[in-house]
């Protein structure tokens, strides 16, 4: 029987997408709109203080395409905190116009064996600890997608021996290293938590790099034989100070 992977786990993650009710937004007064924006900016300031204390991280993105208008990404110590954030958003005046859409719940994880070091067990170095509880880069673009490993007869990731999985992931990691400085990623595990098995969040200064890295990785055996993907959501980073201009009528 194949050996299960042991993971070390970090912060909990929530990807929360919202449609914006522009029709209703246009019906309220300019003063009401500004009051709603001011209140929400105060909430963002609260999140910034949490990030400053390294107790969590967040990012807000204007979604490209019609899957959503906004994507909020939150990293926190617990699911209780993630649920509290969702509720805080809904209680604000702006929350009346932020219609809940797709969401994804997961936990940052690293496998205890490092495929980039011949499968040796990881040491919980400062680097690994930082990766488990990261500050999300405030780069211009983010891309999120869920994925799973195939469990088909004869092509079942969970039947492969640990050594073979390590080799395939090493090759996959070498492809990723080509994009160092161009793309950063956060991998979250979601088995038992959401519809897919993992979530992948990529950050880049140039969205073209999302296309390039995902395309090149499609040729890795770990992807060609064993990977399945959900929908991709791409967004542009929204600064707190931009909110008023973005929602102006």
UniProtKB/Swiss-Prot annotation:
Gene that produces this protein: chdC
GO biological process, one term: heme B biosynthetic process
Cofactor: Fe-coproporphyrin III
GO molecular function: heme binding; metal ion binding; oxidoreductase activity, acting on the CH-CH group of donors, oxygen as acceptor; peroxidase activity
Pathway per the UniProt entry: Porphyrin-containing compound metabolism; protoheme biosynthesis
InterPro entries: CHDC, ChdC/CLD, Dimeric_a/b-barrel
Protein name as annotated: Coproheme decarboxylase
UniProt xrefs under Pfam families: Chlor_dismutase
Catalytic activity reported: Fe-coproporphyrin III + 2 H2O2 + 2 H(+) = heme b + 2 CO2 + 4 H2O; Fe-coproporphyrin III + H2O2 + H(+) = harderoheme III + CO2 + 2 H2O; harderoheme III + H2O2 + H(+) = heme b + CO2 + 2 H2O
Organism from which the protein derives: Oceanobacillus iheyensis (strain DSM 14371 / CIP 107618 / JCM 11309 / KCTC 3954 / HTE831)
The record's free-text note on cofactor binding: Fe-coproporphyrin III acts both as a substrate and a redox cofactor.
Family indicated by similarity: Belongs to the ChdC family. Type 1 subfamily.
Binding site for Fe-coproporphyrin III: 145-149, 172
EC number of the protein: 1.3.98.5
Matches recorded under NCBIfam families: PRK12276.1
Keywords: Heme, Heme biosynthesis, Iron, Metal-binding, Oxidoreductase
